[in-house]
């Protein structure tokens, strides 16, 4: 009357949801799904950070170049322009 299959079914029914959450199978499945979700989220964050770094690096390089050209133009125009005007007067 007590077959192995009947015994395991009775234990599961008596344990209810508490035993189901305690089984390793459910824990492994949940942890795997969380790990996959965490991995995807980390990958998305890394991609976003890399894109921001690329933008900031390219923007910083352009800004430096623009400033250096502006400084060169101003410094070369003022002394040369003033000295020529002083000499002609």
Swiss-Prot record:
Membrane-spanning residues: none
Name assigned to this protein: cAMP-regulated phosphoprotein 21
Modified residues (N-acetylserine): 2
Chief site of localization: cytoplasm
Keywords associated with the record: Acetylation, Calmodulin-binding, Cytoplasm, Phosphoprotein
Gene Ontology molecular function terms on file: calmodulin binding
Sites of Phosphoserine modification: 33, 56
Domain of life: Eukaryota
Subunit structure: Interacts with CALM1.
Presence of keyword Transport: no
Gene: ARPP21
Region of interest called Disordered, as start-end residue ranges on this chain: 1-89
GO cellular component, one term: cytoplasm
PTM description: Phosphorylation at Ser-56 favors interaction with CALM1.
Organism this protein belongs to: Bos taurus (Bovine)
Reported function: May act as a competitive inhibitor of calmodulin-dependent enzymes such as calcineurin in neurons.
Location of the protein in the cell: Cytoplasm
